[in-house]
């Protein structure tokens, strides 16, 4: 039986209890690395293309560890580089597929992004799976759960608006909360 989104969010808050400092610090390092590259014209975007996927897998490893009450460590955000070829391949394929679907209209692009949303969690757990297989598995896992995932994301819009009022500082706390909630979602659909 699938849990309600509010239950997943409550579980995420429980996982973050006592771990907020680690979570905020880890996301701050992630944001500094990825964000700094995005502000460097041209070359930053190119370099960012090659590190965003592995860093995202690392964030998934970190959030899954926190979600499971395991030993989460800041260094986990760099563990996506251990399986670099597969992770980069999956990231580039996701970018291309989502872009192609978005060319049709915005809605198909959003649906494609949601369908592939579990790819990095799959790669975080299984470093033997190939890029295309991870994308296919994500698409299969999300079959019947896309709306639930979309609604989970919508629950954070109010919080995001409040974070804007803090000149973005609130996102240091909101980002881990959102990502742990998505990790809980992954665990829930994996068990379903």
Region roles according to the model:
Residues 1-192:
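Hydrophobic alpha-helical membrane segments
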């Amino acid at each position: 039986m699938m849990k309600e989104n509010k239950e997943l969010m409550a579980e995420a808050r429980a996982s973050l209890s006592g771990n907020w400092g680690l979570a905020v610090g880890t996301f701050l390092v992630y944001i500094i690395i990825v964000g700094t590259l995005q502000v460097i014209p041209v070359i930053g975007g190119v370099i960012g293309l090659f590190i965003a996927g592995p860093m995202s897998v690392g964030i998934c490893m970190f959030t899954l560890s926190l979600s499971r009450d395991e030993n989460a460590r800041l260094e986990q955000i760099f563990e996506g580089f251990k399986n670099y070829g597969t992770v980069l391949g999956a990231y580039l394929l996701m970018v291309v597929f989502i872009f192609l679907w978005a060319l049709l209209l915005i809605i198909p692009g959003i649906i494609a992004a949601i369908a592939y949303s579990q790819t990095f969690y799959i790669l975080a757990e299984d470093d033997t799976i190939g890029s295309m297989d991870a994308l296919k598995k994500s698409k299969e896992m999300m079959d019947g759960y896309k709306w639930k995932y979309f609604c989970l994301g919508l629950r954070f819009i109010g919080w995001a608006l409040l974070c804007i009022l803090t000149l973005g500082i609130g996102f240091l706390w909101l980002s881990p909360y959102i990502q742990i909630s998505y990790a809980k979602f992954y665990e829930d659909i994996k068990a379903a």
